[in-house]
């Protein structure tokens, strides 16, 4: 049934106005305050929250009481007078909303904060794209991928909707492809929802708002740098407007052969932000550091000429900031791997550098002998490093000295292997083989022939002879053939045979492993005597210490060379010595039981330094303090152990070693190396040695506990290790003595104000160059290029002092002024160093001095010469004098002529004038010339005088005659 129309200022309209105002719709508020009759402006609409806003919001929204709602006819009239909120009103259908209470102010403010609109540049770029016009709710695609929170958005416009009682329909979403919709221009889709509460309510006011959940796409930004030095500052590249989801990639690429060094100047990131520094090697990205490891001052170097900085943030309240300084540095190839049984010599690791490889005697190089460092985004060697391998057979011509070694690789797939070596000495010489090591498997065989074929005389056959001929083998001629046969899949045999050629009529050169010898004749002729000695820790066995070359017809040594083997126990009384495991450097045998007793001076004690210790877990090494095996044990070791240092309290020390007889089952270790030296027995530490290229100072005369020794290096050397050592309570030093290493780098010369610099190597090694360039408006004073070079004495230094960049005006030369009777070409007030100034003289003057002077750089700058002088030209001066003299002569003649002519002319003019005057005016003239004396007829009156014509005439004539 129809209801009464409410008043314009009814409570329901006030509530609607309040809700619209709180939700931020000025249009709705304006519509509510439209006029006295409550008429709505055609362009206005109500904005009220719908039931689909939030569950909490739904509970706080109720429709007005039926008694306060407009009538059916009034609502239909209002509906016809209002424009639709959307162009296609028919596509949006509404149902009556549930009757809920209006939300409180706190709830609305909370809802507004949660539904804050967030726009992204990606969305803005899609304006006008129908495909992107509508953004729907969607499930997250990948939980592992970081996604931005999906904010709810409120559409900027809503409409007051009515629903007739005979047409209730469920809420529907508008068609995405609806033509002409404003959504096609980039706005978000509007949806509405309502539900019918009761059939008794015929008409109700629908509270509608649109809620859109948008999953934002990130705002992408990419910046590339190619300068050799610069800064990456996040504040220089702010995010696009309305964007809180940002992904930025900063790429720095420098010249090929150079890398990029990043130094962290500052980093201030918010929680959840990601900052990653990556090395770029083609398509491969390698993380060098991330935000968890970045601290101020940290330096990261790229392995190639490109480095990438990736920054990602989800923050909408404020973005993190960071600043990185980058500069180019010269890349180098990695140090090439040294081949086993070989050596490598590297000339330079930078581009163009060369590495040379060679193998020890008996090994052959597999691969290139020389590698070159190739200039690339990541410098690399021209090929793989070669390897040194012992060949299976081979031929040696013109042999002198060499080795035959057991092959490095197994044979065929079935395990069989046949190796043949042919050794030929120069004509007239013979060969001697010394079998330093010969360990053959029971199924392996070695045969040695005195000749090039297997039909030659037999010298040795391992199947026929059980003992090894350690004295060696001599050829009958100039060649030897060695055959080695193995049936093992993995080569178990090991041998090392040394050969040498020698002249007939002489003895061969003797050889002793782990020892040395002296000879009376280096040519080993008849009668030569050789004396052998062993290295420390070894003793002579199986031969005399002295042998002699005998037999003139066929010279040979009167006895075999002895062997030097590591002793299994013994008594040592030297002030210093070495204790080695039995059979060192070969592995010790199983079942060994050795005891060494060391005795030094009575007032001394023993310092034992265990340098290497590698035993099996079933073998035991025990060290006792004293000359008896007593319970006072200094140390007991088994297995592998780090280096140890021990002191005895007496001048005696006992070392006991026991190897397990079942070593073949449980395995054996490699052995041990120990050095000992006698030290002072009093309460002081042993004296420490001097160091090369340095010196030491001692805090006390006696090296008692607490005494310190300080080491220092000569100029040009850096100390490596602790420079100060302290005598500890156990009379041992706190650390090993240091050593001095030659300094191969320069100290940083520093920055130059108003300039930039380019460093070839940030480590500043010898050869590093620094190029300084002044900023515009400044001039470099000094050398622009500094090079670090090494000196024989002293530390490396730079080739010149640090330059300075001074302003052009402060270095300019002032204009020196104009020379008298001269002028300048291209006049200026200031002249920069290097500029020149040219002077010229006026005609008739000659320039004395430099025509052109140059501004010389200095403090202050000055001209290269003084101001020139313009003097009168001598020839011009003489011509001027002659002209002046001629002018004066002509002037004097003219003056004399004028002096004569002018008076004559004046007299003539006077006479002529007088004559003209007299002749023309004598009849009526009353003028008489005055006379110097009184006239005899002065008593005659004037009238009488001039009235007598005869008298006048006579007097006139008489006057003329008198004149």
Swiss-Prot record:
Residues 1-31 form the signal peptide. Residues 28-63, 116-150, 164-204 are annotated as: Disordered. It comes from the Eukaryota. It holds the Pfam family Sushi. Glycans are attached at residues 251, 268, 290, 375, 398, 414, 454, 516, 558, 614, 682. Keywords: Cell membrane, Disulfide bond, Endoplasmic reticulum, Glycoprotein, Membrane, Repeat, Signal, Sushi, Transmembrane, Transmembrane helix. The keyword Lyase does not apply. Residues 47-59, 191-204 have a biased composition (Low complexity). Residues 32-897 are extracellular. It is found in: Cell membrane; Endoplasmic reticulum membrane. Residues 331-390, 505-566, 683-742, 744-807, 811-872 form the Sushi domain. Disruption phenotype: Mice lacking Sez6, Sez6l1, Sez6l2 exhibit motor discordination, and PCs are ofen innervated by multiple climbing fibers with different neuronal origins in the cerebellum. Candidate tumor suppressor gene. May contribute to specialized endoplasmic reticulum functions in neurons. Belongs to the SEZ6 family. This is Seizure 6-like protein. It comes from Mus musculus. The gene is Sez6l.
């Amino acid at each position: 049934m129809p209801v009464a129309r409410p008043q314009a200022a009814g409570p329901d309209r006030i509530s609607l106005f309040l809700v619209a105002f709180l939700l931020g719709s000025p249009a709705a508020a304006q519509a509510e305050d439209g006029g006295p009759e409550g008429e709505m402006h055609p362009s206005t609409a109500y904005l009220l929250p719908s039931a689909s806003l939030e569950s909490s919001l739904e509970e706080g929204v109720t429709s007005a009481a039926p008694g306060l709602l407009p009538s059916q006819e009034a609502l239909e009239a209002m509906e016809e007078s209002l424009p639709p909120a959307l162009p296609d009103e028919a596509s949006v259908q509404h149902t009556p909303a549930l009757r809920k209470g209006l939300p409180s102010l706190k709830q609305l403010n909370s809802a507004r904060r949660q539904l804050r609109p967030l726009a992204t540049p990606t969305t803005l770029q899609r304006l006008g794209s129908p495909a992107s016009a509508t953004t729907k709710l969607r499930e997250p695609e990948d939980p592992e991928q970081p996604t931005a929170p999906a904010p709810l958005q409120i559409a900027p416009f809503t409409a007051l909707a009515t629903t007739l009682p005979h047409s209730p329909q469920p809420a529907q979403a508008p068609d995405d492809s609806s033509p002409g919709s404003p959504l096609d221009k980039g706005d978000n889709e509007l949806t509405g929802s309502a539900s019918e509460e009761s059939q008794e309510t015929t008409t109700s006011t629908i509270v509608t708002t649109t809620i859109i959940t948008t999953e934002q796409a990130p705002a992408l930004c990419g910046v590339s740098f190619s300068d050799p030095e610069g800064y990456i500052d996040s504040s220089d590249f702010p995010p696009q407007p309305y964007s809180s989801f940002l992904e930025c990639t900063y790429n720095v690429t420098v010249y090929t052969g150079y890398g990029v060094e990043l130094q962290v100047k500052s980093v201030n990131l918010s929680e959840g932000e990601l900052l990653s520094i990556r090395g770029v090697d083609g398509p491969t990205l390698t993380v060098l550091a991330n935000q968890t490891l970045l601290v101020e001052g940290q330096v990261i170097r790229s392995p190639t000429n490109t480095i990438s900085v990736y920054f990602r943030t989800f923050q909408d309240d404020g973005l993190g900031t960071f600043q990185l300084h980058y500069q180019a540095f010269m890349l180098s190839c990695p140090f090439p791997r040294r081949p086993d049984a070989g050596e490598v010599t590297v000339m330079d690791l930078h581009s163009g550098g060369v590495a040379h490889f060679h193998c020890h005697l008996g090994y052959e190089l597999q691969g290139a002998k020389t590698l070159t460092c190739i200039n690339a985004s990541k410098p690399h060697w021209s090929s793989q490093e070669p390897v040194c391998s012992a060949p299976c057979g081979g031929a040696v011509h013109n042999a002198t000295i060499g080795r035959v070694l057991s092959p490095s690789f197994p044979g065929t797939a079935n395990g069989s292997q046949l190796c043949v070596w042919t050794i030929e000495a120069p004509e007239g010489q013979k060969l001697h083989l010394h079998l330093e090591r010969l360990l053959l498997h029971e199924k392996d065989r070695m045969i040695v022939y005195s000749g090039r074929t297997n039909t030659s005389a037999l010298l040795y056959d391992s199947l026929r002879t059980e003992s090894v001929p350690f004295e060696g083998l001599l050829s009958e001629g100039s060649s030897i053939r060695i055959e080695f046969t193995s049936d093992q899949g993995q080569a178990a045999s090991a041998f090392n045979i040394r050969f040498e050629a020698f002249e007939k009529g002489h003895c061969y050169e003797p050889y002793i492993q782990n020892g040395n010898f002296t000879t009376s004749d280096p040519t080993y002729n008849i009668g030569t005597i050789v004396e052998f000695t062993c290295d420390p820790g070894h003793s002579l066995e199986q031969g005399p210490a002295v042998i002699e070359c005998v037999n003139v017809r066929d010279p040979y040594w009167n006895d075999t060379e002895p062997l030097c083997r590591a002793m299994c126990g013994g008594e040592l009384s030297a002030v210093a010595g070495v204790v080695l495991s039995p059979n060192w450097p070969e592995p010790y045998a199983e079942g060994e039981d050795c005891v060494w007793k060391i005795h030094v001076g009575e007032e001394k004690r023993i310092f034992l330094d265990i340098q290497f210790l590698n035993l099996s877990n079933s073998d035991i090494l025990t060290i006792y303090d004293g000359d008896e095996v007593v319970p006072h044990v200094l140390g007991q070791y088994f297995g592998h152990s780090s280096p140890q240092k021990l002191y005895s309290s007496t001048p005696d020390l006992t070392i006991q070693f026991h190897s397990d007889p079942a070593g073949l089952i449980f395995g054996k270790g490699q052995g041990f190396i120990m050095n000992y030296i006698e030290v002072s027995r009093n309460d002081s530490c042993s004296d420490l040695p001097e160091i090369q290229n340095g010196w030491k100072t001692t805090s006390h005369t006696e090296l008692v506990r607490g005494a310190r020794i300080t080491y220092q290096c000569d100029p040009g050397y850096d100390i490596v290790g602790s420079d100060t050592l302290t005598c500890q309570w156990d009379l041992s030093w706190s650390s090993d003595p240091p050593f001095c290493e030659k300094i191969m780098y320069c100290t940083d010369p520093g920055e130059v104000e108003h300039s930039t610099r380019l460093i070839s190597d940030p480590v500043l090694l010898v050869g590093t160059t620094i190029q300084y360039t002044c900023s515009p408006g400044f001039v470099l004073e000094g050398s622009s290029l500094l090079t670090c070079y090494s000196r024989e004495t002293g530390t490396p230094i730079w080739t010149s002092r640090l330059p300075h960049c001074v302003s052009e005006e402060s270095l300019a030369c002032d204009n020196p002024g104009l020379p008298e009777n001269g002028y300048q070409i291209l006049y200026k007030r200031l002249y920069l160093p290097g500029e020149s100034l040219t002077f010229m003289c006026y005609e008739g003057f000659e320039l004395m001095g430099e025509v052109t002077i140059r501004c010389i750089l200095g403090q202050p700058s000055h001209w290269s010469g003084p101001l020139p002088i313009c003097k009168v030209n001598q020839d011009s001066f003489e011509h001027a004098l002659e002209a002046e003299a001629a002018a004066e002569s002509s002037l004097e003649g003219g003056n004399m002529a004028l002096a004569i002519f002018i008076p004559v002319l004046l007299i003539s003019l006077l006479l002529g004038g007088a004559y003209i005057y007299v002749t023309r005016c004598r009849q009526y003239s009353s003028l008489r010339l005055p006379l110097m004396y009184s006239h005899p007829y002065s008593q005659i009156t004037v009238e009488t005088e001039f009235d007598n014509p005869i008298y006048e005439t006579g007097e006139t004539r008489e006057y003329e005659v008198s004149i």
